[in-house]
């Protein structure tokens, strides 16, 4: 014979179910989905490529300012100002780091292996920057690990910081000063 649960017992069981965390909350993954990671990587790569291109001497350089948004990702005013300073400095440092220092003739940068993690309103993207700069009959290739920090507000994502992770790395497309 089955005894019916008293009303109070049933209420306690239902309340316990409501208070217990759901299994979805327990499996909350901090990794950012691949589409957003790609979006962040494109935005970060655009800034690095612009700095790399500043190393190559051009007679009629495109003098547009740093973008305020790339691929739907806003660039914070502080990061944009830092990028402008970096580009101006790099335009004057366009010699290969070899004896005789011929001028750079080409530069290409790409970010590979990007992995983004969300923590609260912050997304951190870590990736390897691969830069190739050409001069005369030679080239210099560098691989440097970088971290980019983004803040989110609703659906809007803003790039708020960037730094090199390897303490001894001296990327060719980075300004000399510590203001970044």
What is the predicted role of each segment?
Residues 1-29:
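Amphipathic, hydrophobic N-terminal targeting peptides for secretion and organelle import
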Residues 11-20, 39-48, 123-127, 157-159:
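Hydrophobic alpha-helical membrane segments, chiefly transmembrane helices and signal peptide h-regions
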Residues 18-38, 42, 165-180:
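N-terminal low-complexity, Pro/Thr-rich disordered segments
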Residues 90-137:
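Surface-exposed, charged secondary-structure patches
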């Amino acid at each position: 014979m089955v005894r019916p649960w008293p009303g109070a017992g049933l209420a306690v069981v239902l309340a316990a179910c409501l208070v217990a965390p759901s299994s979805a909350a327990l499996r909350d993954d901090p990794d950012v989905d691949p589409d957003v990671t790609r979006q962040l990587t494109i935005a970060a790569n655009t800034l690095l490529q612009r700095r790399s291109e500043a190393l190559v001497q051009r007679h009629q350089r495109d003098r547009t300012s740093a973008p305020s948004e790339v691929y739907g990702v806003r660039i914070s005013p502080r990061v944009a100002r830092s990028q402008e300073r970096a580009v101006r400095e790099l335009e004057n440092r366009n010699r290969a780091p070899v004896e005789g220092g011929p001028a750079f003739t080409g530069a290409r940068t790409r970010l590979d292996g990007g992995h983004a993690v969300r923590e609260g309103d912050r997304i951190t993207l870590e990736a390897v920057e691969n830069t190739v700069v050409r001069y005369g009959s030679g080239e210099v290739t560098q691989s440097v690990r970088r971290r980019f920090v983004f803040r989110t507000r609703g659906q809007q994502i803003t790039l708020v910081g960037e730094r090199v992770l390897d303490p001894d790395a001296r990327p060719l497309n980075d300004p000399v000063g510590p203001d970044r």
